[in-house]
């Protein structure tokens, strides 16, 4: 039976309307010759792109991105064709790339069944003896949950750890702000949870854009995280009988979230911090606070240290090690206004990217649906209201636009609006999940209602989060338990408030301090805001970037959440990476360094990197501009929010790229940094961070423009269902976008890591 492959360009308009630089889809058809002599198409793929100027009839023979050739038909027949079954071209492309060593991306995912990959991998990685560990240094940049847990565990194993953070203390890391909880597949509620369900919910929540093996590993180790934290003394909430309590978060139908009131991040960070302090006291961790990473140093192709700036003295310092671990968090502050701490930045990760590490899925950003709305242009920070509030709070807007206008103008109180005049739109649209749909779904729905004129605050960009029903429900339950009159409305209301206060008291207090309204008596006002970044440095299964010896963990990497993170999974990933994954995988790399000896920081590579940083700082300090750093940061944030926020389109993304390019040129021409570089200078620190944001912002827009589909938090207006839901394109975009740095950001090279799913069926997400 004869077989052949053909290649053709997919023209969507007359050929003469294209320019030579236009990128077209290549259609690959695999034919099977039937007994009657006719050819039948048994499979076709349109996942490859080619610029018109690069196309010719022999394009496929030379193109390294898609090495399938007609001469490969024997390979196809031997490896992929079983009688009349069609070939899976996505799997074929992956196999061919790996067999010919063409792709620069090697995920290093172990072979074998999905549920055995991690245990098998752990049993086969090389180890380093305790006697050799004491001679090996590891630098960890960032001491939040991921970095702090990694520092403590690596030092406990015997490595010498050099930890760096730009805060006064690792207790000031942004991890402390996490509120709602941490997921784990312990099934304490007996509601059908399991490792597989946590794995599946995470894959589905990420809209099938994450690496299957990494996500399953995360679900596997989740239970161990809870055991570790309980052993440290983390005061998780408990039921009356003393068992650990759970609650639900968005995108799931079980209760698997462990929590410590509304301060879960703080308590988990204190656990990691205490473990770190034990190793600091033993001399195994050298803690360097108020130090900011300026560059990574690569010697003989390996990460061997970093350059830092002492934020107090301004001194540029050289620090060497056998490996470097980045745990520097996400880049939400690219938007200027976000729920992130003011100092959170992308600089450490971006410096590594500029030295050769690929940056994955930069446009995959999470917009959290429950945040305190923007109240004015003077703001520089937004405040999160935990997703846990959606367990008991009901989200609504008025059914009638005229009622919304009256509420905005102060003519009507929300508590005076009848139930029949309220639109609980999430419950209406998604009856199965209701108010606990995933964050990207809830955020887009809130935006749609406000854009349609139903917003309830003065700016028209807010919806209500109402606890009145929960207060009465809990109050009646409490009254029944106590044998009290459930018809006594004031008594029931008082009892219900007590239950809500026990669950969310600190969150309600924080809301009242900021907004000056009592959420026990009137609904909260909320609106989506930038909260988390799923994108980050590309890493393999071992959490190593494309720079040997350089690892990225926690929010600094792209690893586990695809196009949308489920609530309470950030803390899970950070602690999984730090406590359980990295300490196992890094040994395999460091096994080659047991005879290396100390790494010198006096090499030409270190000196060159230090000189380059000093020159850059001198250039910024001597600039004769007149505009503040915040002036540029705020404009950048508005460009990104308006053009690359909750919804995107080709026109706006192209506009954003041009605007950011123009803004970056103006920044280096007009920025003014006051003070001097040899003392504490927050203006200088900000300027260096914003300079990196101005480059990342362009790549962010380029990435969003290149992905012609909607998935998770990446919503392209051109690609949506009739109901306004995200419309994925699995044939063409089932891959991780990994970008190679180019000084001309718009020309950054895209590498694709194709995603294969063994245990999950690809289907459109539905939460109805």
Which stretches of residues belong to each language-model region?
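Extreme N-terminal leader/targeting segments of oxidoreductases
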Residues: 105-138, 156
